[in-house]
């Protein structure tokens, strides 16, 4: 089950709802 909590500011949510590093340093 996906818990709807905020990701860290530099993370993004992937298609599975996981917080993934790092939205400012990749594609």
UniProtKB/Swiss-Prot annotation:
**Gene Ontology CC annotation, any one:** extracellular region
Q: Does the keyword Secreted apply?
A: yes
What would be an example GO MF term here? Answer: potassium channel regulator activity
State the compartments where it is located.
Answer: Secreted; Nematocyst
Q: What is its main location?
A: secreted
Keyword Secreted, does the record have it? yes
Keyword field: Ion channel impairing toxin, Nematocyst, Potassium channel impairing toxin, Secreted, Toxin, Voltage-gated potassium channel impairing toxin
Regarding protein family, the annotation reads: Belongs to the sea anemone BBH family.
Q: What does this protein do?
A: Possible voltage-gated potassium channel (Kv) blocker.
Q: What is this protein called?
A: Toxin Bcg III 21.00
The protein's organism comes out as Bunodosoma cangicum
Q: What is the lineage of its organism?
A: Eukaryota, Metazoa, Cnidaria, Anthozoa, Hexacorallia
């Amino acid at each position: 089950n996906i818990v709807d909590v905020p990701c860290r500011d530099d993370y993004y949510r992937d298609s599975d709802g996981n917080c993934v590093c790092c939205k400012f340093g990749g594609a």
